[in-house]
């Protein structure tokens, strides 16, 4: 009789824990996701602070995602982590060392999905 109670108790615990998994993630179609990058100021100046903001369309991206900016001039990468801004965007501060045309690869990580989108920032 004690064994049956023990098995029943374990079964109830397993059922309760399986219900605590939260809402299932909404599937993301990688082909539908677009990324855009904006800067403040709109035209960055070398050696001055710049705030970059990455936003996404084609999928609902939340604070559960991670976004990294891969900034390159002459193929020299500099990785910058972003912070979710609460309004669907991810922001990071950066100082561009010199004028030029920088390639910025926006890396989006959601669960086991990794997407990379490319943008360009022209610095004066």
Each language-model region and where it sits:
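Aromatic sugar-binding surface patches on proteins
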Residues: 86-91
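Short amphipathic beta-strand segments in non-cytosolic proteins
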Residues: 56, 68-81
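N-terminal edge beta-strand
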Residues: 27-47
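Bacterial signal peptide processing site
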Residues: 21-23
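C-terminal motif of bacterial Sec signal peptides marking the signal peptidase cleavage site
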Residues: 16-19
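Edge beta-strands of extracellular beta-sandwich domains
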Residues: 115-123
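Beta-strand-rich structural segments
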Residues: 46-60, 106
């Amino acid at each position: 009789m004690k064994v049956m109670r023990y098995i029943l108790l374990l079964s109830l615990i397993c059922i309760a824990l399986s219900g605590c998994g939260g809402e299932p993630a909404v599937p993301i179609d990688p082909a539908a996701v677009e990324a855009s990058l904006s800067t403040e100021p709109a035209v960055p100046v070398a050696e001055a602070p710049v705030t970059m903001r990455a936003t996404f369309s084609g999928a609902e991206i939340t604070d559960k995602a991670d976004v990294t900016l891969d900034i390159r001039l002459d193929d020299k990468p500099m990785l910058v982590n972003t912070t979710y801004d609460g309004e669907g965007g991810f922001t990071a501060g950066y100082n561009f060392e010199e004028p030029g045309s920088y390639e910025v690869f926006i890396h989006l990580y959601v669960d086991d999905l990794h997407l990379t989108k490319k943008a360009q920032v022209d610095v004066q």
